[in-house]
């Protein structure tokens, strides 16, 4: 076998007959498989041991030679080579076909490659191949046309007319083979190039397509006649096995049936030819052979598929590759692995952030080899076999050994569906009793796990390297930030939030108010003994608290609560004391009003202070983000554990529960509803009198009920008691929101019908009062729609993620700096008055392209090519700068990836991105993972305002990434200038917009009902929208440059996600959009050897032009092409990646004709062939490092180098560091 890690590339071509013979170990002549009595393979049959190798290791068929010592000997009795039985997976056979047969991929595919090569229509080809017509091979001196088609009857007439032997015409694949042999590629290509200079319309399109195919044959060295098969390869028997079932029956792969059919028909044809049978019988047999081979290669592609028992279509070779169950997606891209298990998860509140609980019986099975090795090493038993017995018996001694083996050995936990990389994280196992895996409560958010019966899978990394990677890169304590937006993903939730909320509440007049304590311990003791309440405001000496006080704050009394003292206890030392839940307190420290000189009047000071709100979920998130910024991961994960324990402890002490008495009653609910009823009656009256349309009536009624519900909601909020448990749960962000609250205490309101339309009759009751039967029915109506939507959305979102991953999987950080001279000018994204994404958010974590100066003073804020930190971004915005030119993925020059400077920081770590990071996959996951949170609906703008629906949510994201024509498309102008007039034409129900500019005038027809974005006298830029709606990106590309289109798409995606409250970093969308626009269509080849109309990678296009320009020739011109992600995935340079994505047969057909080479640059193609992926530690620059032991003393104090040997490169691999440093002395 070839060593996969030694491959540079992989090529696919058409197989020539001689190639097929060179693969084969013998001809399969009989259709038999195995003998039903002996169960041994038949000679010369489909499972023959002589051809394919022995069925038992190191043993020939007759049993003369047994054991490994005879390896390589071919038995003189039975002819079987003594070798491993594994060769039955790799040795091929062949069938010599007695008549040539066409390959269905090349004849039937779209476009038909055979048809284009011969310039014949697919229908004519079909008639010839399946013996329904003759084709003229050589007209000789007759007036017949070369390649003309004639029926049996016409053929006989022509023979009578011109005499026998006066011309040559044949039928079947043999005729096509003769024609293909006659094709002179060079001559045809030259003629087509000439024709292209003058041709137009349909003729030109056809010529371009033919030229493409002929050029592919010419350049790849494939011969066109190889599309016709004279010899058929037989795949190894272990890839089409026969298994004995209990009961003596056999289960066999469908391929065996299909091969049997071919062999039977081939043998029958041979016999008929020997007997010199009548032509019509031979023809019929040849046609049947052709159909049998078609079925073997792609059953069902032409005519009715061949079926097996129960009229099930048989799975042919093509079906073995296609689809989710095919070879690519089922066995090559994802495999089942050993050393894995799965179980239900339960909560493990006592675990540390980096730990998970593994049941003992699971652990002993997973770590069995490690335990056995240790048993032998300790001389408890002598050999592995005995050790295995010991483990299986459950000997007492194994448990201590297991404890030691799992120490420092991380395991991976995964929860399906794995929507982003946080769906697999590493933990240190802790042995527990029971059968459920224990999971830390804080990692639930990343996994989207809960404990209502979810299951998780566990995997054991085996090699030293795998363990090191799991420990350093994948440990759960390291994953504090979410890769999609750089915000903490591990924030306390539910009980933890509630506990900390309760702990930090302030109340006036509770016991112990105004007491002063000398230190923390005294305050806590007073609280424990019941002298002071947790929420009472008290004083404490600042000197006793280990916090960064200023000089004025020292030797003072701080006014706070016992709860806040406990809350601040868990915070790291360098962090200010947290008294108010806001960012100012977090970054700048406690405001002066909370300090009192020693001996001051504390009661008076307290009475002058307002009560502070407690710390909510959002505040806790901000605290965690700030701590991460200052102290990085280790300290943050320790703090999170302390915050979790504190939260659980105090939510238990508080004992907050929900009872029916906690749901308040709104006194004037009846009046509000009465008023609305009256208004609805008035509206109905107006409609009956014909004053308003039905649509207007419907909108007014629904708006009225919405207003009633909002009124009730406002009353509830105004009258809520901050100590009400439901209000506390809601306000803290632990569970529930105002909508839930108003359904419990106000009214349920309007419901959606299954068709998405809102029903006019509202549900007036709330859950406290209870619903009537009719109301209950209405609410199930709406609820059912919610459930179906969710189910459909999940599938849609998953498929979107798959397409995104596919298009971007080869985008990897390849170098430090690409040295580009272009940048992207960015400003905040806004829609009307609404801010979508601020400039500060867009700048954070990016590199500048140009110097940024203060607009007033001219002082330099930040130089070129510098990283913009959070503080710098704030400084830039505060200075009043509105637009900044930054390094962007759009303008990066790196081939097959991005450079570090154009990408900026890795949002998951907050540091500059490392070379080797697979940013394409991260981007795809970041956009796909929140997909399920987006709505499905097409948004109705109230039925009146516009004539089209605006697509939103998930369908809009798909529309953008697939570059489809949007629903409700906006009309755009191609002229830059002034809108001179807008005329309405009542007869055609349209408006005309006139734009006058320096370069010319434009006249645009827009629908009568369209909402205008411009008015007379307004200035418009090129490509600006004249009406409301979405711009079609392909049209925008025709009038503007590539960067404008990329910027537009980026803004549109952000609008959809931000409107749903989902934050995604710009860079992820940039990576995706760049992948959609990396191809060029050649308009004029100039002096290059490119073909007109070819779609090619922009880098290859530039290279071809470079070579021509150096030689002094005319460069080619091309036009950038915007492709949807599905099309872009299929057009990628890697045929392995494209074939494993969609349309497998089409991709492979095309690749084979072109003789495509896959340079294995992406992740998918390397996974498929089993090579380590070229990202992360798999990159060549990291693979070539040899680790060696380092003397610690020398490492810390390196010896002084002598002069003269500066060239040596010393590489130090330090296991505690993620990156590998190359230090050149």
UniProtKB/Swiss-Prot annotation:
One annotated Gene Ontology cellular component of this protein: DNA-directed RNA polymerase complex
Annotated positions binding Mg(2+): 450, 452, 454
Alphabetized SMART domains for the sequence: RPOLA_N
Catalytic activity reported: RNA(n) + a ribonucleoside 5'-triphosphate = RNA(n+1) + diphosphate
Binding site for Zn(2+) 1: 60, 62, 75, 78
Entry cofactors: Mg(2+); Zn(2+)
Binding site for Zn(2+) 2: 818, 892, 899, 902
Ranges in a coiled coil: none
Pfam families for this protein: RNA_pol_Rpb1_1 (PF04997), RNA_pol_Rpb1_2 (PF00623), RNA_pol_Rpb1_3 (PF04983), RNA_pol_Rpb1_4 (PF05000), RNA_pol_Rpb1_5 (PF04998)
SUPFAM superfamilies, per database record: beta and beta-prime subunits of DNA dependent RNA-polymerase
GO biological process, alphabetically ordered: DNA-templated transcription
EC number, UniProt record: 2.7.7.6
Keywords, comma-separated and alphabetical: DNA-directed RNA polymerase, Magnesium, Metal-binding, Nucleotidyltransferase, Transcription, Transferase, Zinc
Enzyme class: transferase
InterPro entries in alphabetical order: DNA-dir_RpoC_beta_prime, DNA-dir_RpoC_beta_prime_bact, RNA_pol_asu, RNA_pol_N, RNA_pol_Rpb1_1, RNA_pol_Rpb1_3, RNA_pol_Rpb1_3_sf, RNA_pol_Rpb1_4
Domain of life, per lineage: Bacteria
Cofactor, how bound (note): Binds 1 Mg(2+) ion per subunit. Binds 2 Zn(2+) ions per subunit.
Statement: the UniProt record of this protein carries the keyword Transcription: yes
GO MF term (any one): zinc ion binding
Function, as annotated: DNA-dependent RNA polymerase catalyzes the transcription of DNA into RNA using the four ribonucleoside triphosphates as substrates.
Protein's name according to its UniProt entry: DNA-directed RNA polymerase subunit beta'
Gene: rpoC
